[in-house]
Curated annotation (Swiss-Prot):
Residues 1-38, 185-228, 260-285, 332-354, 389-449 are annotated as: Disordered. Residues 218-228, 336-345, 435-449 have a biased composition (Polar residues). GO terms for molecular function: lipid binding; SH2 domain binding. Changing P453A: Lack of pedestal formation. This is Translocated intimin receptor Tir. Residues 185-200, 422-434 have a biased composition (Basic and acidic residues). Residues 1-233, 384-550 are cytoplasmic. It is a multi-pass membrane protein.
Length: 550
C-alpha cells in the first residue's frame, strides 16, 4: 500500500514507493505483503544476527498495518538468547502466557499441569493465591527442552536475560543440595552446622588471611488449633437446639390461641325453687282469670231476694286452680333438673376436649422440642469434648538460613617464597557464599514449595563469573571421593583445612572445570600470583609445602 506524501515536495501529486522490508527468518513479503514485487535484497537484506525468538503473541496485533514492512524490531531477539548457560531460556515481554505469569507472580517457582482438554497450564502462587495461564505449544516445547528429568517445575530467575528479560530455569531444591554438600564435606557433622573454628580453605605462604564463617538459623513455628466451629457436627447440634427452642415457643402460642378455651363453671337452678315459683305464678294467673267471670264466684242473696257476688271463687274453681298450679310446678321442677344436667354435660365435654388438645400439643410440641434441645446439647458437648481431645493442629514451620561471610586478606608477597594457590578458591567461594548469604530457603511441613535460588541475587549482569553454572560444580565436589576428609589444625600455627586426596581430584578438579569454562582468568583470581593460567597451574607439578593438597 503506497504511503502518501506528507511534505512540501514539488512532486506532491506523486506517491512515495513502499519501503523495502527488513526480513527475518520469515520473508517480510510473505508476512503481510502478499503479491509485492519487492524482494528482500539490498543493503538491508541480511539480518542474520537477529531472528524471532518464538511466535510472539504480539505478532498478530499490528504486523499487517502496512503490508511489506518488516516485523517490529522489538519482537526480534538474538538467537543465542533462546538457551543460556543456566540451562534455561529467556521470556520476552510479548504479553504471552509466560510473560503474563511472570508479571503476576514475579521471580518465583511455578509448575506445569495437563488440563482436561489436553492443553498445558502453568500454575504459580503469590500471596496464597494460585495464578494459572494456558501455555502455547511453543512455550511448552521450550519448557520440555530444558526439563530433562520431567519434573514439570520451573522458576523465574528475575531480569537476568537480555534487556531485563526474565529467565526460566528448572526448579531445584537448593536446601537439599546444600545439605548433601555439607554432608559430604563434613561426614561427622552429617551436614549440620559447621564450627566457626574450622577453616576449609587453604592459605598460601606469605599471605595473612582470616576468615570467619557464621551460619545463623532462625526457626519460626506457628501452630494454629482449628476451632470447634469449623466442625459441621457442632453446627448441626446448635441447629437442633435452636429448632427445639422454636418448637417450645410455637407450642406455647398455639395452646394460648388455637386450643379450646377453658369452660366456665356450669350454671345450676334449684328444682324446688323453680317448682314453687312456677306453682305460685300459675295459681295467681289462673285466679285472676277466674275472677273475671262472675259465674266462678259464690252468690249471696240479700233481703230483697237479689243475687250479689260474694268475691269468693267457687270451691270447684279453687280446686282446679290448685291442680293446674301444682302441675305447672312439677313441669318447672323437671325443666330445672334437665337444664342443670345439660349445663354440667356441656362443661364436662368442653373440659375433656381441652384436656385432650393440651395433651396432644404438649406431647408433640413440648416433647419433640425438648428432645431436640437435649439432643443438640448432648451433641454439642460431645463434639466439643472430642474436638479438644483429637483436634487437628495446623502447624507451619518456616526456617530461614542466612550465611554471613567476612574476609580480611593481608598482603600477598611472591618474594616470600609462597604461591597463593587458594586465591582463586577464596574468590570463587566468596562469590558463592555471597550469593548464598542473600538466598533464603523456606520450607514447610505442609508444602513442597521450591523457592527460586536466583531470584534475589544481586550480582552484576555483565559479570562473566556471575553467569557461570554452579550446580555441576557442587555436584562434582560432592560426588568426588577425594574431597571427603577435612584436617583441622590447632595451636600456634595458622588455621588451615587441608583436603586429603591426590592432585587433580577434589577441589582441583573444580578449578579445572572453572578454568575450562572461563571462570578463572588472569586478573580474576588465578591459581598463581604470576601470569600463568589456571590450566597450567593445574597441570604443573605440585608445590611442596602446606599449600599443596596431599
Amino acid at each position: 500500500m503506497p504511503i502518501g506524501n506528507l511534505g512540501n515536495n514539488v512532486n506532491g501529486n506523486h506517491l512515495i514507493p513502499p519501503a523495502p522490508p527488513l526480513p527475518s527468518q520469515t520473508d517480510g513479503a510473505a508476512r503481510g505483503g502478499t503479491g509485492h514485487l519487492i524482494s528482500s535484497t539490498g543493503a538491508l537484506g541480511s539480518r542474520s544476527l537477529f531472528s524471532p525468538l518464538r511466535n510472539s503473541m504480539a505478532d498478530s496485533v499490528d504486523s499487517r498495518d502496512i503490508p511489506g514492512l518488516p516485523t517490529n524490531p522489538s519482537r526480534l531477539a538474538a538467537a543465542t538468547s533462546e538457551t543460556c548457560l543456566l540451562g534455561g531460556f529467556e521470556v520476552l515481554h510479548d504479553k504471552g502466557p509466560l510473560d503474563i505469569l511472570n508479571t503476576q507472580i514475579g521471580p518465583s517457582a511455578f509448575r506445569v499441569e495437563v488440563q482436561a482438554d489436553g492443553t498445558h497450564a502453568a500454575i504459580g502462587e503469590k500471596n496464597g493465591l494460585e495464578v494459572s495461564v494456558t501455555l502455547s505449544p511453543q512455550e511448552w516445547s521450550s519448557l520440555q527442552s530444558i526439563d530433562t528429568e520431567g519434573k514439570n517445575r520451573f522458576v523465574f530467575t528475575g531480569g537476568r536475560g537480555g534487556s531485563g528479560h526474565p529467565m526460566v530455569t528448572v526448579a531445584s531444591d537448593i536446601a537439599e543440595a546444600r545439605t548433601k554438600i555439607l554432608a559430604k564435606l563434613d561426614p561427622d557433622n552429617h551436614g549440620g552446622r559447621q564450627p566457626k573454628d574450622v577453616d576449609t580453605r587453604s592459605v598460601g605462604v606469605g599471605s595473612a588471611s582470616g576468615i570467619d564463617d557464621g551460619v545463623v538459623s532462625e526457626t519460626h513455628t506457628s501452630t494454629t488449633n482449628s476451632s470447634v466451629r469449623s466442625d459441621p457436627k457442632f453446627w448441626v447440634s446448635v441447629g437442633a437446639i435452636a429448632a427445639g427452642l422454636a418448637g417450645l415457643a410455637a407450642t406455647g402460642i398455639a395452646q394460648a390461641l388455637a386450643l379450646t378455651p377453658e369452660p366456665d363453671d356450669p350454671t345450676t337452678t334449684d328444682p324446688d325453687q323453680a317448682a314453687n315459683a312456677a306453682e305460685s305464678a300459675t295459681k295467681d294467673q289462673l285466679t285472676q282469670e277466674a275472677f273475671k267471670n262472675p259465674e266462678n264466684q259464690k252468690v249471696n242473696i240479700d233481703a230483697n231476694g237479689n243475687a250479689i257476688p260474694s268475691g269468693e271463687l267457687k270451691d270447684d274453681i279453687v280446686e282446679q286452680i290448685a291442680q293446674q298450679a301444682k302441675e305447672a310446678g312439677e313441669v318447672a321442677r323437671q325443666q330445672a333438673v334437665e337444664s342443670n344436667a345439660q349445663a354440667q354435660q356441656r362443661y364436662e365435654d368442653q373440659h375433656a376436649r381441652r384436656q385432650e388438645e393440651l395433651q396432644l400439643s404438649s406431647g408433640i410440641g413440648y416433647g419433640l422440642s425438648s428432645a431436640l434441645i437435649v439432643a443438640g446439647g448432648i451433641g454439642a458437648g460431645v463434639t466439643t469434648a472430642l474436638h479438644r481431645r483429637n483436634q487437628p493442629a495446623e502447624q507451619t514451620t518456616t526456617t530461614t538460613t542466612h550465611t554471613v561471610v567476612q574476609q580480611q586478606t593481608g598482603g600477598n608477597t611472591p618474594a616470600q617464597g609462597g604461591t597463593d594457590a587458594t586465591r582463586a578458591e577464596d574468590a570463587s567461594l566468596n562469590r558463592r557464599d555471597s550469593q548464598g548469604s542473600v538466598a533464603s530457603t523456606h520450607w514447610s511441613d505442609s508444602s513442597s514449595e521450591v523457592v527460586n535460588p536466583y531470584a534475589e541475587v544481586g550480582g552484576a549482569r555483565n559479570s562473566l563469573s556471575a553467569h557461570q553454572p554452579e550446580e555441576h560444580i557442587y555436584d562434582e565436589v560432592a560426588a568426588d571421593p577425594g574431597y571427603s576428609v577435612i584436617q583441622n589444625f590447632s595451636g600456634s600455627g595458622p588455621v588451615t583445612g587441608r583436603l586429603i586426596g591426590t592432585p587433580g581430584q577434589g577441589i582441583q578438579s573444580t578449578y579445572a572445570l572453572l578454568a575450562n569454562s572461563g571462570g578463572l582468568r588472569l586478573g580474576m583470581g588465578g591459581l598463581t600470583s604470576g601470569g600463568e593460567s589456571a590450566v597450567s597451574s593445574v597441570n604443573a607439578a605440585p608445590t611442596p609445602g602446606p599449600v599443596r593438597f596431599v
